[in-house]
């Protein structure tokens, strides 16, 4: 439950994270590169950002969303015609934070290829489905979970109706977008998200949340 935010998350797996994208900064390894000017060190995620790889890991919340958005905008400014690869391992989180990421994905020029590693639950699953069609992937043992937004409110009785209308509006909006991304009917999406709905990688492909399963790199 919460007081002021509508969320969409798998609550049993939410944990607090200290870094921008949900990765513990104290555990981040460093990479040392040799350049013409000598050695240069990067944390591993900054180095992967040079390869246009972004990690969305952990709970979706405002601080993480702002940094994901900043990385998306930076990579667009660097090369607007090159794809960006968004790796997702998330139990979900804030709907507003997730929609900020989603809107930026649609706003910028580069195609966004989404890849589920581990899990993409709730808002994580929504962002997974929002990648460029034909470029949305799951790894073989990844799990995807879709459901309706979770909400709660504490306050005056007269405000309850206002908040109830808002959460129903958001539920309808998310279902319409999910139907658009998956090719399912709105009625089916509404029915399938009424309760927690877990899907294997194969089921996620069949449902239309992703386009294919990545077993290994093509050049391996």
UniProtKB/Swiss-Prot annotation:
Q: Does the keyword Cytoplasm apply?
A: yes
**Biological-process GO terms, alphabetical:** protein quality control for misfolded or incompletely synthesized proteins
Q: Where in the cell is it found?
A: Cytoplasm
Enzyme Commission code(s) on record:
3.4.21.92
Instruction: Check the record and name the Pfam families matching this protein.
Output: CLP_protease
Gene Ontology cellular-component annotations: cytoplasm; endopeptidase Clp complex
Q: Write down the chemical reaction(s) this protein catalyses.
A: Hydrolysis of proteins to small peptides in the presence of ATP and magnesium. alpha-casein is the usual test substrate. In the absence of ATP, only oligopeptides shorter than five residues are hydrolyzed (such as succinyl-Leu-Tyr-|-NHMec, and Leu-Tyr-Leu-|-Tyr-Trp, in which cleavage of the -Tyr-|-Leu- and -Tyr-|-Trp bonds also occurs)
Output the Gene Ontology terms for molecular function. ATP-dependent peptidase activity; ATPase binding; serine-type endopeptidase activity
Which InterPro entries does the record associate with it? ClpP, ClpP/crotonase-like_dom_sf, ClpP/TepA, ClpP_His_AS, ClpP_Ser_AS
Q: Which UniProt keywords apply?
A: Cytoplasm, Hydrolase, Protease, Serine protease
Q: Where is the active site?
A: 122, 147
Q: Entry's Gene3D superfamilies? A: 2-enoyl-CoA Hydratase, Chain A, domain 1 (3.90.226.10)
Protein role:
Cleaves peptides in various proteins in a process that requires ATP hydrolysis. Has a chymotrypsin-like activity. Plays a major role in the degradation of misfolded proteins.
Subunit organization: Fourteen ClpP subunits assemble into 2 heptameric rings which stack back to back to give a disk-like structure with a central cavity, resembling the structure of eukaryotic proteasomes.
Fetch the PANTHER family from UniProt.
ATP-DEPENDENT CLP PROTEASE PROTEOLYTIC SUBUNIT (PTHR10381:SF70)
Assigned protein family: Belongs to the peptidase S14 family.
Name assigned to this protein:
ATP-dependent Clp protease proteolytic subunit
Instruction: Give the originating organism.
Output: Colwellia psychrerythraea (strain 34H / ATCC BAA-681) (Vibrio psychroerythus)
């Amino acid at each position: 439950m919460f007081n002021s935010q509508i969320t969409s998350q798998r609550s049993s797996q939410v944990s607090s994270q200290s870094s921008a994208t949900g990765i513990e900064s104290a555990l981040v390894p460093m990479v040392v590169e040799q350049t013409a000017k000598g050695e240069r060190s990067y944390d591993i995620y900054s180095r992967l950002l040079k390869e246009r790889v972004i990690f969305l890991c952990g709970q979706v919340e405002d601080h993480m969303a702002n940094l994901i958005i900043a990385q998306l905008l930076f990579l667009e400014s660097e090369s607007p015609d090159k794809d960006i690869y968004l790796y997702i391992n998330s139990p979900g989180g804030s709907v507003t934070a997730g929609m900020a990421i989603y809107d930026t994905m649609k706003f910028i020029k580069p195609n966004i290829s989404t890849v589920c590693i581990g899990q993409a639950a709730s808002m994580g699953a929504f962002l997974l489905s929002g990648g460029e069609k034909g470029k949305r992937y799951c790894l073989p043992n990844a799990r995807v979970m879709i459901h309706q937004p979770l909400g709660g409110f504490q306050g005056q009785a007269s405000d309850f109706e206002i908040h109830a209308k808002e959460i129903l509006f958001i539920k309808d909006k998310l279902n319409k977008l999910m139907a658009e991304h998956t090719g399912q009917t709105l009625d089916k999406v509404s029915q399938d998200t009424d309760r927690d709905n877990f899907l294997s990688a194969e089921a996620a492909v069949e449902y239309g949340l992703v386009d294919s399963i990545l077993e290994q790199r093509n050049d391996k």
